[in-house]
From Swiss-Prot:
<feature type="coiled-coil region">
    <location>
        <begin position="270"/>
        <end position="348"/>
    </location>
</feature>
<dbReference type="InterPro" id="IPR026504">
    <property type="entry name" value="MNS1"/>
</dbReference>
<comment type="function">
    <text>Microtubule inner protein (MIP) part of the dynein-decorated doublet microtubules (DMTs) in cilia axoneme, which is required for motile cilia beating. May play a role in the control of meiotic division and germ cell differentiation through regulation of pairing and recombination during meiosis. Required for sperm flagella assembly. May play a role in the assembly and function of the outer dynein arm-docking complex (ODA-DC). ODA-DC mediates outer dynein arms (ODA) binding onto the axonemal doublet microtubules.</text>
</comment>
<dbReference type="GO" id="GO:0031514">
    <property type="term" value="C:motile cilium"/>
</dbReference>
<dbReference type="GO" id="GO:0005930">
    <property type="term" value="C:axoneme"/>
</dbReference>
<dbReference type="GO" id="GO:0005634">
    <property type="term" value="C:nucleus"/>
</dbReference>
<keyword id="KW-0966">Cell projection</keyword>
<keyword id="KW-0963">Cytoplasm</keyword>
<dbReference type="GO" id="GO:0051321">
    <property type="term" value="P:meiotic cell cycle"/>
</dbReference>
<keyword id="KW-0539">Nucleus</keyword>
<keyword id="KW-0969">Cilium</keyword>
<dbReference type="GO" id="GO:0005879">
    <property type="term" value="C:axonemal microtubule"/>
</dbReference>
<dbReference type="InterPro" id="IPR043597">
    <property type="entry name" value="TPH_dom"/>
</dbReference>
<keyword id="KW-0175">Coiled coil</keyword>
<feature type="coiled-coil region">
    <location>
        <begin position="385"/>
        <end position="450"/>
    </location>
</feature>
<dbReference type="Pfam" id="PF13868">
    <property type="entry name" value="TPH"/>
</dbReference>
<comment type="similarity">
    <text>Belongs to the MNS1 family.</text>
</comment>
Length: 498
């Protein structure tokens, strides 16, 4: 109202300004015209010039009037255009205000319904619980990741220690092999030296034998030459034999000692070789044992993996069968529910119709009895008021007819009032149903909006029953629906296993 008053005042002000401008323009034009006439009067002296002046003045006046008419028309057109613009702006402002008011009103109604809706509050509580579950699952997953990383580090450490141990064992084997090779080379060199010594001794013995033969030959020659020296030669020969025997004894003793030493060295070499062989056999046995353990572990892991794969395949097959059974059961339950709903609606409609008919009969009977009682009461009241029994027959009949018409009029008024009351009750009930339908529609719209806003972020953590049916799932894309169906089938199969 205030905006309309302001707009009217603005239009009046614009109109006054336009009128003042027009009056100012006329005044200035008159002044110019008077000045022009004065100049013409001073300049024109002859009659011809006066006539010419009058003719020019008439032309000027006509031109001036024409310009004035055009200016007035332009002013009026401008004023009408401004008025139309103002009216259009006013209508637009009113329409914008109405739209804003309706929007605020709708938003307040929606907010009130959201705050008072038990269903939306329960949905928000379920979503909050889902967010908490997602947070807990994320924490558990993080702990599992840390645990897995720690196990991975421990396993890597164990593998590194095993590699270090194997490398140390290989290095020890290399060192033992090198020592064995050095001892073997030493033994070979020692045997070579012994062989050289034995060869040298044999050569010395052969030289001794050669010398002995030469001595024998000299002795024989000396014996032949000088019989006197025979005894001496014999003594020398005896001495030589003793020397040979002693040499043989010493040689035999040395040989025995050397053989004993060589046997001892051979025994030690053989013992070392046996020890090395036992170590190699033990190492190979340990390697074979590790290989057998590794092979057994690999076979066990392969068997376990195959078993788990078979279990997963069986579980997947059971999940698929369970999902198909659930789909069939869901379709069957849906059909049964639809049938039950239709039967229930039919029974409710039939029961409602019967109740309405019975109620209508009761109301009609009560209304009829009430009307009869009302008629009798009003007739009795009118009769008592007019004392009909004291009138003659004609007046009494006239009065009774008058009373009857009055009662019928009252009954008609009561019927009209009854009908009006029923119509008002029907309108109120319809209005209440409309408000309830509007409230349910807003609740459903807000519920779907909340689901679309949060469900994609909580996939895998949504509680059961948060979706009412396929209509809710159709709010999302195909990927979300497939993931949701798969997770629901997994949960159902896990429950079945448990």
């Amino acid at each position: 109202m205030m905006m309309s008053r302001k707009n009217v005042t603005y239009r009046q002000r614009e109109k006054l300004i336009a009128e003042a401008q027009r009056q100012e323009f006329l005044r200035e034009d008159r002044i110019k015209h008077l000045n022009y006439e004065q100049q013409m009067a001073e300049s024109l002296k002859s009659e011809e010039r006066v006539e010419k002046k009058r003719f020019l003045q008439r032309l000027q006046n006509e031109e001036h009037e024409k310009r004035m008419d055009e200016a007035i028309q332009l002013g009026e057109e401008s004023r009408r255009l401004k008025e139309r613009q103002l009216e259009q702006e006013e209508r637009m402002a009113l329409e914008m205000a109405r739209i804003k008011h309706e929007k605020l009103k709708d938003e307040k109604i929606r907010q009130q319904i959201r705050e008072n809706s038990t269903e939306l509050r329960e949905l928000e509580q379920k979503l909050k619980a889902a967010y908490l579950n997602r947070e807990r699952a994320a924490q558990i997953a993080e702990k599992e990741v840390l645990k897995y990383e720690q196990m991975k580090e421990d396993l890597e450490t164990v593998r590194k220690m095993q590699k270090d141990q194997e490398r140390a064992e290989d290095e020890e084997i290399v060192r033992e092999t090198k020592r064995y090779q050095e001892k073997l080379n030493y033994q070979i060199e020692l045997e070579r030296q012994l062989e050289e010594k034995e060869k040298t001794r044999q050569e010395a013995y052969h030289e001794f034998l050669k010398e002995k033969i030469l001595i024998d030959e000299i002795v024989r020659k000396i014996y032949e030459e000088d019989q006197m020296e025979t005894q001496l030669k014999l003594e020398k020969m005896n001495a030589t034999r003793r020397y040979i025997e002693e040499f043989k004894e010493q040689q035999q003793t040395w040989r025995n000692m050397e053989q004993t030493r060589m046997e001892e060295e051979n025994r030690k070499i053989l013992a070392f070789a046996n020890m090395q062989q036992r170590r190699e056999e033990d190492r190979m046995a340990e390697v074979r044992e590790r290989e057998q353990q590794k092979k057994a572990l690999q076979e066990k892991l392969a068997e376990q993996i195959q078993k788990e794969q078979q279990q997963r395949e069986e579980l997947e097959q059971m999940r698929e069968e369970l999902y198909l059974e659930e789909q069939a059961e869901e379709a069957r339950q849906k059909a049964i529910s639809e049938m039950e709903k239709k039967i229930r609606q039919r029974l409710e409609m039939q029961q409602t119709f019967e109740e309405q008919m019975a109620f209508k009969q009761i109301v009609q009977q009560a209304a009829k009895e009430e009307e009869e009682a009302f008629v009798q009461a009003m007739l009795a009241k009118f009769a008592e008021d007019d004392r009909i029994e004291q009138m003659n027959a004609q007046k009494r009949r006239m009065k009774q007819l008058e009373h009857k018409r009055a009662v019928e009029k009252l009954l008609e008024e009561r019927r009209q009032q009854f009908i009006a009351d029923k119509e008002r009750e029907l309108q109120e009930r319809q209005e209440e149903e409309r408000r309830e339908s509007f409230r349910r529609a807003i609740i459903e719209e807000e519920r779907q909006k909340i689901l679309k806003q949060h469900a994609t972020q909580l996939l895998g953590y949504l509680p059961k029953g948060i979706f009412k049916g396929e209509d809710d799932l159709n709010l999302f894309d195909e990927g979300f629906r497939q993931d949701f169906q798969k997770r629901r089938a997994d949960i159902s199969s896990n429950d079945g296993w448990d």
